[in-house]
Amino acid sequence: MVVAIEPFATDGVGRVVERGVAEVFRADGLAAGVPGGDPAVLAAIREFNGLPFARRQLAGLDRGRVEATLRALSAARKLAAYPPLVDADGRRIAQAEHTVYVGSEGVEVLTN
């Protein structure tokens, strides 16, 4: 089992909500392609093997084709979008993450 630990700290109300334009995505089920998706953009997204990726990681590709492909993936329900997390009252949040694998042999830290 893989576990992600993501503590948050804020001087706000302490309730995290999603707000704004998503910059992080996760795509799944792209083996057959997607109508309206650009082949080069889809190939780049496949390289992430279902792991989350940021829009900036596609910066070397044509921006219009990237945006059109992200819209096509979303319409085909093959894209999860992750909007920025903010405190419910708009105050700043500090966030860290640590990922660990818990197996029969023990625990292995996957992040640096």
Please report, for each region that a protein language model flagged, where it lies by residue.
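Active-site neighborhoods and metal-handling regions in enzymes and metal-associated proteins
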Residues: 1-112
